[in-house]
Amino acid sequence: MLFKKIRGLFSNDLSIDLGTANTLIYVKGQGIVLDEPSVVAIRQERSGALKSIAAVGRDAKLMLGRTPKSIAAIRPMKDGVIADFFVTEKMLQYFIKQVHSSNFMRPSPRVLVCVPAGATQVERRAIKESAIGAGAREVYLIEEPMAAAIGAKLPVSTATGSMVIDIGGGTTEVAVISLNGIVYSSSVRIGGDRFDEAIISYVRKTFGSIIGEPTAERIKQEIGSAFIQEGDEVREIEVHGHNLAEGAPRSFKLTSRDVLEAIQAPLNGIVAAVRTALEECQPEHAADIFERGMVLTGGGALIRNIDVLLSKETGVPVIIADDPLTCVARGGGEALEMIDMHGGDIFSDDI
């Protein structure tokens, strides 16, 4: 036991938000030290067999839609869980080495990984095994809504009911939390990726042009809006795509109203999930939520007026957390402190 405590003094514990779109790492005592796209570029043999890692993170994301046949840019996470085990493990190895160099005085780190509330036991086991394969000494799992709530400074340890809506790249997690536990949770596989896909589909159907994921993401970030109020400025963006009829590059303009029309279906899915949560939570918790409001975290919280949309559709106040992109990773870091105080059995590390 004493040796274990001494090892802990020389080891930087890590909280990893292993997201579909981005991976964030929080180091105890330092804060967020890594924020990189969850993308890996791999070189392939002519037979299609994996050869080597060409790039990871930002460098790999720049290759999306631009690679020669010998290189494939892969996003190994889909809907918040592992889609490609080998590539995920290599990506984690790379990211952990960026923030933690192991030696005798600094052994392999303890790692806490945030997982979707709706992840199956098989999916959770895959995440845990991937982290161990990437060099973790011990691995704990925490559900993303709990980590998000802790990172957003919600009173998770009290009897008061708190609702958190975490909109990530692959999933939206809706949860009610009370007394250090999740009393209601739902996970819908709708997130930033679905918004991007909807924009790509809309552009193809309406303008007869093809655009890639990076362009769709830029459109979403620059002029995307979940709700347009009377008097709001209608924003425009010039887009360059490949015209299907002419077979040549062409430019056209998109407005914020176009984008709202494009992303209406995924927005409706998120609204439906939130409404269901409000209907199914306990009456006392519902009263707490109506009084204190719902808290938005994750990258999706940055979509313009998404708080306005959810408030108008539910009649409940909506608050966007401070720095919503990092809430899950920061909350996981605080959870590591709780592990030191109470032991690892407070989290789902039993798989």
Curated annotation (Swiss-Prot):
Chief location: cytoplasm
Transmembrane segments: none
Subcellular location as annotated: Cytoplasm
MF (Gene Ontology): ATP binding
InterPro entries with a match to the protein in the record: ATPase_NBD (IPR043129), MreB (IPR004753), MreB_MamK-like (IPR056546)
Keywords of the record: ATP-binding, Cell shape, Cytoplasm, Nucleotide-binding
Gene3D superfamilies, per database record: 3.30.420.40
Function of the protein: Forms membrane-associated dynamic filaments that are essential for cell shape determination. Acts by regulating cell wall synthesis and cell elongation, and thus cell shape. A feedback loop between cell geometry and MreB localization may maintain elongated cell shape by targeting cell wall growth to regions of negative cell wall curvature.
Official protein name in the record: Cell shape-determining protein MreB
Source organism per UniProt: Pasteurella multocida (strain Pm70)
